[in-house]
């Protein structure tokens, strides 16, 4: 969870997993969802293996495959400036959507449109032109 400074809202479990502090969930990732939905998602979140954040990538698919990225401009979990930088670095086609971290839930039509554009652009060929 990145913002101006790293968030302390990620809580570790004794067995190596992390989850978002339920009292901070809505403010961190779900400000644009109805409160009842944010509360439900907070209560039903599944912990993630902390090791997943340290696992090295062995292949950078963006080097030879078309890449598309969505910057959630109101994201409180992943700083939008960092998201833009990563997407630009990879040569991704960037779409900005005014939404928080759970953009695929709060703005499903906009996200689907980006996916459809990406699918049409490769036309069955998912390799970048050389």
Report the location of each language-model feature.
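Catalytic active-site module of serine/aspartate enzymes centered on a nucleophile-bearing elbow/loop
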Residues: 92-130
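Active-site nucleophile elbow and catalytic-triad environment of alpha/beta-hydrolase enzymes
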Residues: 40-61
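Active-site-adjacent alpha-helix of alpha/beta-hydrolase-fold enzymes
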Residues: 80-93
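Short, proline-enriched alpha-helix->beta-strand connector loops that line the catalytic pocket
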Residues: 62-67, 89-92
